[in-house]
């Protein structure tokens, strides 16, 4: 079977700690977005959905307790199982891949692949604790690069910074591969 995306939805991009989304819990936010998603495909009902795959980079605090399943329940999809996938910044991309694989394997026909992250709500609990001291030099290198006082970013043989923010990674790759914003 072929896997296809039939509809998409997303929230506006918020401003961490001060934007219009800062007071919305991640489970409530994901339920709002999925309500919008389902309105775009009225022929699809919760009875058609084989699974809700929810990507979440910080599945703790308000995003904990299997936010995939919690979102399904908030939507009234009590018969729909849910799973939380953690692959940090690419968690929601992983859910799309998982849904496509499940369809191709014949495990189901209809999956909701989603993702949620509410940085403003991290004060209510998060999973990341202290960083491993082994990466201190790499983190310092990233911080120095972020100041803009260093040469252009390029791959190197040093230990990579496993804690680098996705936005900084995107900037580095765009610079290295000469990808414009146009």
Annotate the PLM regions.
Residues 1-3, 15-46, 61-65, 72-182:
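Acyl-thioester C-C bond-transforming condensing/cleaving domain
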Residues 47-55:
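Short glycine-rich phosphate-binding loop at a beta-alpha junction
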Residues 54-62:
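A glycine-/small-polar-enriched, mobile loop at the entrance of the PLP active site in fold-type I
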Residues 8-13:
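Short polar catalytic/cofactor-binding loops
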């Amino acid at each position: 079977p072929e896997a296809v995306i039939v509809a998409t939805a997303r929230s506006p991009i918020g401003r961490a700690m001060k934007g219009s989304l800062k007071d919305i819990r991640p489970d409530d936010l994901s339920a709002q977005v999925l309500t919008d998603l389902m309105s775009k495909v009225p022929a699809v009902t919760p009875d058609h959905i084989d699974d809700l795959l929810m990507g979440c980079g910080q599945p703790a605090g308000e995003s904990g307790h299997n936010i995939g399943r919690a979102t399904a329940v908030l939507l009234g999809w009590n018969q729909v199982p849910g799973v939380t996938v953690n692959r940090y910044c690419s968690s929601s991309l992983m859910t799309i891949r998982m849904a496509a694989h499940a369809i191709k394997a014949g495990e189901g026909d209809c999956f909701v692949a989603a993702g949620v992250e509410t940085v403003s709500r991290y004060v209510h609990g998060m999973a990341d604790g202290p960083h491993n001291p082994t990466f201190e030099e790499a983190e310092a290198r990233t911080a120095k690069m972020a100041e803009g006082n260093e040469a252009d970013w390029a791959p190197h043989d040093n230990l990579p910074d496993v804690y680098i923010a996705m936005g900084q990674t995107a900037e580095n790759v765009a610079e290295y591969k000469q990808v414009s914003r146009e």
